[in-house]
Amino acid sequence: MLRLPSSMPIVSFPANPNLLINPQPSWPSRRGNSAVVVSAASRDVDSFTSKSGYLFSLSADEADSLSEYNFPRIDGMYKKKPLILLRRLAQIGTTFSYWFGLRLADEALERSDQMFKVRAAELRKLLVELGPAYVKIAQAVSSRPDLIPPIYLDELSLLQDQITPFSTEVAFNMIEDELGLPIDELFSEISPEPVAAASLGQVYQARLRRSGKVVAVKVQRPGVRAAIALDTLILRYIAGLIKKAGRFNSDLEAVVDEWATSLFKEMDYLNEAQNGIKFRKLYGGIKDVLVPKMYTEYSTSKVLVMEWVEGQKLNEVNDLYLVEVGVYCSFNQLLEYGFYHADPHPGNFLRTYDGQLAYLDFGMMGDFRPELRDGFMEACLHLVNRDFKALAKDFVTLGLLPPTAEKSAVTKALTDVFQDAISRGVRNISFGDLLGDLGKTMYRFKFRIPPYFSLVIRSLAVLEGIAIGISPNYKVLGSTYPWIARKILTDSSPQLKSSLQNLLYEEGVFRIDRLESLLSESLRTETALVQKPVVGTESNIAMKQMLAFTFTEQGSFVREILLREFAKGLDAYGLATLDSFTFSGSGPSSSLTEEDMTNLRTFYRLISLFSGMQKAKSQVKAVSKYGEALTPLDEASLVMYQLPSAQEMLPILSILPELPQESQQRLLQLPGDLVGRLVTRAFARTIRRIFL
């Protein structure tokens, strides 16, 4: 499950599964032998047990019976044991007061710089002593190198999979109790010491006796359920006090409940096994993604057996390609299926030795409802296109703003806050910076943080943090937006189609610049996960990809828009051609309306778009620059003059045979479709001229 550290020797279990297996088990079973051999690393009592072991008195009965988070029940349990609650409050208070006191003393004595590393290490140790709830919070923070100093980052990163393990004797006894068989009947080999330890449990490497498969055996840490139950109770009390004081707009109690619900699900290893099975089914087929197999027949609520994966932690290798794979997989999780990994810290990813991205630990998962997924994509779309009025409505849809919020004031505030952030283009937008900018307006307009939102945002923020550790200039939104653009252009959701229609037709005017941007971004998905460059010129590759996309079933909605606008433009082109002969010697008169001129400019942009996007961008500026000073007929002549010549259109013709058969068949239907639309427009124009 986790990388086997080189410093951790495997005595009874060879790391290489091709090596010969020792037929005699090298561990004692308490059922067959009263002697117990404990590894040197496990002889020391871990600090969580040492400092917070008094919580175990509850773990033996009430806490272990909590199969899921239930605040009223937890509240009732601890009301019967007020001394434990008071002792925990005193422990938390004195622990943090002690550490902050040392920091203040360092500042007073002007030795902060010298003691910085020492205090970082002390903080890590104190968090471990307090238990898994605080470790989980620190793990999230440790994945953001842009938010905390490097020394603290290094220390807190150790919490991801290098926490002091608990006794192997206790772990082996738990395995036997949970699975109902002696260890030597379950495994032919098992490591005498854990190969990794985390906040909720620790992992052993083993080989199944029946099948000989190499597996990871995760065993739950004693007392975690009691500690998390009590700590979430305390956090909820604090959230309630803040709410009563009116110091926060969000329902903090609901946020704590959402987080606690996820933690309790994470402590149920049977639930984790089912999550892993579902995750493997949905995302295991993605290129270069590996999801280990779960062995549910060997798993219980406290013991989980899964396929062993060898590799290195993602933040230990400089592999930006795998980050892109992770971004694509996260896009699928959040916006395609809505079932997402809500705890993506570096310890839960591996780079396998054959270059795949392995996902580990499926305890904390989230569900993103379809209407929220669509709302999130719409918000990204409107943000990138600076449509802040629509963005304010999106925030209502997402539950961030109450429906009664003053939309015009919110729109102005969002414009002030985000205009600067997106001025450098979508590929340079920092997700972390956006969150920081958004925070400036949250209190003023009574923004709320829905319970689901905190997990989604944390997932994206942590993913960007991992990427920044590999590439400091990496922007997760810039890498995700091409997939969002493609999804918006191809999705059958009525909500997204309506949003796209409104974006492209602003007050009835077709915004081809926005379509160009969406198409350009969506085509980046074709090469995002390609390690070897595609052979061919950049313009030819772009044209081929654009045509292939437009003439597929998925591109039907965009194709309809393009055909509609192309027919308008072709109609305007015909009128302009007729005018050039009719009025060539009779002055500046023209039958072209302003709508015809707009359609003609759009026609030029469409032709240029499919014959070379760089040309479109450079030449339209010339039309715009001189258009206002020219008569309609002169401008029409200039546009017609700048249209690509037949020779310049030859690259498109050479690409057509390379398109998929499906696209070629739809292309053959194009002339008939266009003729029908042109006849309809000509008939409608004739009727208007007769009766109007």
From Swiss-Prot:
<dbReference type="InterPro" id="IPR050154">
    <property type="entry name" value="UbiB_kinase"/>
</dbReference>
<feature type="binding site">
    <location>
        <position position="218"/>
    </location>
    <ligand>
        <name>ATP</name>
    </ligand>
</feature>
<keyword id="KW-0418">Kinase</keyword>
<dbReference type="InterPro" id="IPR011009">
    <property type="entry name" value="Kinase-like_dom_sf"/>
</dbReference>
<keyword id="KW-0150">Chloroplast</keyword>
<keyword id="KW-0808">Transferase</keyword>
<dbReference type="GO" id="GO:0010287">
    <property type="term" value="C:plastoglobule"/>
</dbReference>
<keyword id="KW-0809">Transit peptide</keyword>
<dbReference type="InterPro" id="IPR000719">
    <property type="entry name" value="Prot_kinase_dom"/>
</dbReference>
<keyword id="KW-0934">Plastid</keyword>
<protein>
    <recommendedName>
        <fullName>Uncharacterized aarF domain-containing protein kinase At1g71810, chloroplastic</fullName>
        <ecNumber>2.7.-.-</ecNumber>
    </recommendedName>
</protein>
<dbReference type="GO" id="GO:0004672">
    <property type="term" value="F:protein kinase activity"/>
</dbReference>
<feature type="transit peptide" description="Chloroplast">
    <location>
        <begin position="1"/>
        <end position="39"/>
    </location>
</feature>
<dbReference type="Pfam" id="PF03109">
    <property type="entry name" value="ABC1"/>
</dbReference>
<keyword id="KW-0067">ATP-binding</keyword>
<feature type="domain" description="Protein kinase">
    <location>
        <begin position="189"/>
        <end position="523"/>
    </location>
</feature>
<dbReference type="InterPro" id="IPR004147">
    <property type="entry name" value="ABC1_dom"/>
</dbReference>
<dbReference type="GO" id="GO:0005524">
    <property type="term" value="F:ATP binding"/>
</dbReference>
<feature type="binding site">
    <location>
        <begin position="195"/>
        <end position="203"/>
    </location>
    <ligand>
        <name>ATP</name>
    </ligand>
</feature>
<comment type="similarity">
    <text>Belongs to the protein kinase superfamily. ADCK protein kinase family.</text>
</comment>
<dbReference type="GO" id="GO:0009507">
    <property type="term" value="C:chloroplast"/>
</dbReference>
<feature type="active site" description="Proton acceptor">
    <location>
        <position position="343"/>
    </location>
</feature>
<keyword id="KW-0547">Nucleotide-binding</keyword>
